[in-house]
UniProtKB/Swiss-Prot annotation:
Subunit comment: Homohexameric ring arranged as a trimer of dimers.
Entry EC no(s): 2.7.7.56
One GO term of the biological process aspect: tRNA processing
Annotated residues for binding of phosphate: 86, 124-126
Protein name as it appears in the record: Ribonuclease PH
Broadest EC class assigned to this enzyme: transferase
Reactions that this protein is recorded to catalyse: tRNA(n+1) + phosphate = tRNA(n) + a ribonucleoside 5'-diphosphate
Keyword Transmembrane helix applies: no
Function per UniProt: Phosphorolytic 3'-5' exoribonuclease that plays an important role in tRNA 3'-end maturation. Removes nucleotide residues following the 3'-CCA terminus of tRNAs; can also add nucleotides to the ends of RNA molecules by using nucleoside diphosphates as substrates, but this may not be physiologically important. Probably plays a role in initiation of 16S rRNA degradation (leading to ribosome degradation) during starvation.
Keywords: Nucleotidyltransferase, RNA-binding, rRNA processing, Transferase, tRNA processing, tRNA-binding
Cysteines joined through disulfide linkages: none
Length: 255
């Protein structure tokens, strides 16, 4: 039994509250255990200069933490005058992950800005950001469909992320909180689609190595968690969930 009473393959309690920010085209508050992240999606009718004239859209992300999202206060990066390497890595991860399940050509020359703001951190902030940002993105693009700006929802599959690790005492565990992450021999972030395809795997040993068998167990455990997260996403999105992949399926049948 883990310190918070969970079994090895159990997620922390997950809650996704949609339409959390009234001004954003899409927004959620995602809570996974004591980790809480506000995710918003903003649509701009333009693309970065390097994409102009190409007929494709773009999805990019920004990520940040409130100073007291953590146990000790961390100064805002704006006050330091630069973005940390960790923040840059997470921003790129979120953007890459979301672009993997969106038909950018169908989006047209629009940019969707994803903003993930961690208001309380207890492990898994980047994976919570991806899982919440996906819902915010679908809400924003669904609004464009409702307004007649898009013919159909340009999202071909679901997307979610979670963490797994190898605990010195408990072995392979799912959805690490901060204390578990700090003592894990191996920790890994996994991003997957609803079809069970991998989008990203980030795994490292901390003064330790791991075997192929352990890797397979880590990935299997992550997939179990991600399937549960996608079930929650479906429930939150309601009728909009049925539209995901619809255009892609129709095009496949017509070929």
């Amino acid at each position: 039994m883990r310190t918070d009473g969970r079994n090895n393959r159990e997620l922390r309690p997950v809650h996704i509250q949609p339409h959390y920010i009234k001004h954003a085209e899409g927004s959620v508050l995602i809570e996974i255990g004591d980790t809480r992240v506000i995710c918003t999606a903003t649509v701009e009718d333009k693309v970065p200069p390097f994409m102009r004239g190409g007929g494709k859209g773009w999805i990019t992300a920004e990520y940040g933490m409130l100073p007291r999202a953590t146990e000790q206060r961390n100064a805002r990066e704006a006050s330091k005058g630069k973005v940390s390497g960790r923040t840059m890595e997470i921003q790129r991860l979120i953007g890459r992950a979301l672009r993997s399940v969106v038909e950018l050509e169908q989006l047209g020359e629009r940019t969707v800005w994803i903003d993930c703001d961690v208001i309380q951190a207890d492990g898994g902030t980047r994976t919570a950001s991806i899982t919440g940002a996906y819902v915010a993105l679908v809400l924003a693009l669904s609004k464009l469909v409702a307004e007649g700006k898009l013919e159909s929802l340009p999202v071909r599959d679901f997307l979610a992320a979670t963490s797994v690790g190898i605990d010195p005492e408990h072995g392979v565990i799912l959805d690490l909180n901060y204390s578990e992450d700090a003592r894990a021999k191996v920790d890994m972030n996994v991003v997957m689609t609803g079809a069970g395809q991998f989008v990203e795997i980030q795994g490292t040993g901390e003064e330790a190595s791991f075997s192929r068998a352990e890797l397979e167990e880590l990935l299997e455990t992550a997939q179990l968690g991600i399937e549960q997260l996608i079930t929650i996403q479906r429930r939150v999105l309601g009728e909009q969930a049925a539209l995901i992949g619809e255009k892609v399926e129709q095009e496949g049948k017509s070929e």
